[in-house]
């Protein structure tokens, strides 16, 4: 009887394991691409499960405990731990170890600031559901911007800088038209105008997809935090993970909230502390049908 050398068996086992992991990574990436239209990785996906630790006794919320939008948000893809926070002009805003993680959300241009990202995420959710016609945003000044009206309008600014839509010949719906409108929405939004598009909610009711917004009297200076995920224990106590952008466009990222980068979880009191230094602040929820 001929025996296969042990080292050959080891090589075969290692190769089979590597191939299996590669195939599993491709399947995971394909599943994320179907759920998140912006996802571009082809061989793997980084998630809350793979990147973060859960405190003892806590678990993630399941689909029966959240709305479809909240559950979609809670499954968002992340970047690996070595990704720094880039800025739109090139270079870095933060080194990788200065934040918890970067959210895997492709972007390009100066309108992707901390006010713009929540609008961008809402637009991606509606696109995922093929409900683009429901995208509508009240800007800083002027006409409400909605996708159906946009398809038979052109965009101009008044002398006071207000958005005005002038009726023109109907255009066909397209990815180009959708993102062109999104760019205008983000460009003409500020902290205060963002609150005109959402409903105020008690901080204790906050859930994935909700916003924490604080701003000054004029509404031009402030902060926006986006609730990415929520965990709960048997006593009903909840912890949250938030993400944000920068006043000058940068990667959407999860700030370093604790000494351990793998522990992004904070309670409702700390959520409020993020924005309570501003004279106007609160927790808010999108009006999603």
Per-region residue spans from a language model:
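A generic structural motif
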Residues: 138, 213-217, 245
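Low-complexity, Gly/Ser/Thr/Pro-rich intrinsically disordered linker/tail segments
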Residues: 238-289
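Extracellular-facing segments of soluble proteins and assemblies that are Gly/Ser/Thr-biased and enriched
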Residues: 104-199
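Cationic-aromatic interfacial patches
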Residues: 24-107, 112
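...with weaker cross-activation on analogous glycine-rich loops/strands in unrelated enzymes
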Residues: 172-236
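Substrate-binding/catalytic groove segments of enzymes
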Residues: 127-132, 219-221, 233-238, 251-253
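Bacterial Sec-dependent N-terminal signal peptides
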Residues: 1-26
